[in-house]
């Protein structure tokens, strides 16, 4: 599992969000964003992410912390992204991921205070 989580971290930091979606999310993944369902399949998540990622011209992501416990990983990243319209998105987010058979089957994303 360590290698899978490392893959997620590296791809996320490189801005390869769509590629990591296809590689690491289960087809039937359930994704939540601050307690609200964001997507109920990899394809739905991919399509929603694609719209956002397409509007980003600069992508700077730093890993703040990581914990792996059994089949659950908790990753906190600080994101700084600049949109094509020069608007800066500056936020910190926690990803709590449940893994099964080498894929993320559930991910809960939480906005957290700036660290």
Q: What are these regions, as identified by a protein language model?
A:
Residues 18, 22-69:
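A solvent-exposed, acidic/Ser-Thr-rich amphipathic alpha-helical stretch
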Residues 30, 87, 103-105:
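Residue-level signal for well-ordered, solvent-exposed loop/turn and beta-edge residues enriched
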